[in-house]
Amino acid sequence: MTHLQAGLSPETLEKAKVELKENPDTLHQDIQEVRDMIITRPDIGFLRTDDAFILRFLRARKFNHFEAFRLLAQYFEYRQQNLDMFKNLKATDPGIKQALKDGFPGVLSNLDRYGRKILVLFAANWDQSRYTFVDILRAILLSLEAMIEDPELQVNGFVLIIDWSNFTFKQASKLTPSMLRLAIEGLQDSFPARFGGIHFVNQPWYIHALYTVIRPFLKDKTRKRIFMHGNNLNSLHQLILPEILPSELGGMLPPYDMGTWARTLLDHAYDEETDYCPESYTLSVKDLEKDLSPKTMKRSQSVVEPGVLKRPEKVKSEEENMQPLLSLD
């Protein structure tokens, strides 16, 4: 075992070896193989390239060097293309703070039977008069950045439960294709986390309609890990034991305290001074904007072509992407 595997239990070490093909004897070589590909993408500012950081991308892609580098490139490309989203990315940002206090996300104290961290979202808590969908997404990304520091979670991953109880048609009507695609790109395509399951409970018909719209943007692996339980909490409990769930989800624990995770982040001051935020690396947002200008951009010869996440040029459909998916008319 190398120092990079410190903090992993014997069980998780074995899991990393069997499921992820992690080999302590070749770990540094694996990391260097990914690092050597960085030169092929001069159009991207790779703001962090240390061993521990690259390792989480290898674990997320089961030590496939090419796929790990693709994910690393998309991680920074997403941040470059959405600069405003990552400015002031800290728990004390007003929008993020309010989203966190309303349980976006909630983080349960117990792990599931596979050692995965359980995130919960109570969708009806979204107060659209106080913060936006983007604030919720920023709060989730900040939270994931904090949690992914734990090597156990890099190996074991996460489970997400979304409770749609009392989520109104009016709330759903505020969602647009561009919003949902932004979330999919940020969570599915650009973050080194292993999601073992995404569970919908108490979802109304219009959530099924929204899912139909976003389904084409989901990878096959993601689709297979989405479970629509409806009002049947017994089917949820077959996968996640009720002993570790709050009463809102039919569990045996007390109701979830929405402010628990918010207090954790605020108490530890997870903000732009930590390792999770672009400002803390070495390249400022202003520098990124300069580097991305046409005069300084270089043509990439990478096997991972640029523009994987690139927004299309202004075309007729752009206006449609800004329209609500569900109309109140």
Swiss-Prot record:
Name this polypeptide is given: Clavesin-2
- Describe its membrane topology: Peripheral membrane protein
**Which keywords belong to this entry?**
Cytoplasmic vesicle, Endosome, Golgi apparatus, Lipid-binding, Membrane
Tell what the record comments on domains: The CRAL-TRIO domain is required for targeting to the membrane and for binding PtdIns(3,5)P2.
Please state where this protein is localized.
Golgi apparatus, trans-Golgi network membrane; Early endosome membrane; Cytoplasmic vesicle, Clathrin-coated vesicle
Query: GO molecular function terms here?
Result: phosphatidylinositol bisphosphate binding; phosphatidylinositol-3,5-bisphosphate binding
Tell me a GO biological process for this protein.
podocyte development
Domain CRAL-TRIO, which positions?
Answer: 96-257
Role, per record = Required for normal morphology of late endosomes and/or lysosomes in neurons. Binds phosphatidylinositol 3,5-bisphosphate (PtdIns(3,5)P2).
What GO cellular component term, any one, is given? endosome
Q: Which gene encodes it?
A: clvs2
Q: Which CDD domains does this UniProt record tie to the protein? A: SEC14
A Pfam family of this chain = CRAL_TRIO
| Coiled coil, from the record | none
Q: What spans are recorded as compositionally biased (Basic and acidic residues)? A: 308-319
Question: Which additional comment does the entry carry?
Answer: Binding to PtdIns(3,5)P2 is not required for localization.
Is Acyltransferase a UniProt keyword of this protein? no
